[in-house]
Amino acid sequence: MIVTIVGWLVLFVFLPNLMIIGTSFLTRDDASFVKMVFTLDNYTRLLDPLYFEVLLHSLNMALIATLACLVLGYPFAWFLAKLPHKVRPLLLFLLIVPFWTNSLIRIYGLKIFLSTKGYLNEFLLWLGVIDTPIRIMFTPSAVIIGLVYILLPFMVMPLYSSIEKLDKPLLEAARDLGASKLQTFIRIIIPLTMPGIIAGCLLVMLPAMGLFYVSDLMGGAKNLLIGNVIKVQFLNIRDWPFGAATSITLTIVMGLMLLVYWRASRLLNKKVELE
């Protein structure tokens, strides 16, 4: 069994990543895509202000989408965890149902809904709230909406798991000692649910930087993410070495985020043990 698992990991994880790393140090060739000539130019190109700006823009968009998911997801997860046990499975089922549909199809549906002639603008015009359609599509806001729409369930699930495990007697003790609802939330609930918050933020932020089809469909050419750069290099420009170098750089950034999560989790566990 162990040999099978190790073989599967080597064949489908280790070797493909090794090929990408190797390709990132090679030279582009118009005929065969890759020339077996070692170079570091692919990584030095990433220091160009254009690509560095795209990377920072991707981090910024991913951070905003993560914060939006946290603000929207925490109250929903709290509401879900406080419902009767008989009702929770139904709402959890409704939360998971969208995963049965391809996310690309869902983004197309959202694009139709938010377009100038879409249902949202038509409804606002009918109410008399606006006189002319609001331009939402092909803006940074549209990309954020698309990312939140796709990734919100990834925030809700770990938050729900953490909130459900809250020690109720501890909350009751805080009330008995005169703590207000705000004090209880800040000093007890948030620290106890911090593992879920960190896990949810990672589950949202890591894929948010690479969902190129969201920025393609919702943001247009002026709102590119680093995932779009990788896609263009592999599929359009056919510069596989530079695309591989960009992929490795993105992987390193994600790895650093995972390292921060691991360190934060260890510190939280030590703090809980001391208390």
Curated annotation (Swiss-Prot):
Subcellular location as annotated: Cell inner membrane
InterPro entries the record matches: MetI-like (IPR000515), MetI-like_sf (IPR035906)
Gene Ontology annotations for the cellular component aspect, listed alphabetically: ATP-binding cassette (ABC) transporter complex; membrane; plasma membrane
Keyword Cell membrane: yes
Periplasmic side: 22-60, 111-135, 209-241
Residues of the ABC transmembrane type-1 domain: 55-261
GO MF term set: ABC-type polyamine transporter activity
Side Cytoplasmic, residues: 82-89, 157-187, 263-275
Annotated GO biological process: putrescine transport; spermidine transmembrane transport
Mode of membrane association: Multi-pass membrane protein
Keywords: Cell inner membrane, Cell membrane, Membrane, Transmembrane, Transmembrane helix, Transport
Protein's recorded name: Spermidine/putrescine transport system permease protein PotB
Transmembrane intervals: 1-21, 61-81, 90-110, 136-156, 188-208, 242-262
Record has Transport as a keyword: yes
PANTHER family documented for this protein: INNER MEMBRANE ABC TRANSPORTER PERMEASE PROTEIN YDCU-RELATED, INNER MEMBRANE ABC TRANSPORTER PERMEASE PROTEIN YDCU-RELATED-RELATED
Family: Belongs to the binding-protein-dependent transport system permease family. CysTW subfamily.
Pfam families in UniProt: BPD_transp_1
Its biological purpose: Required for the activity of the bacterial periplasmic transport system of putrescine and spermidine.
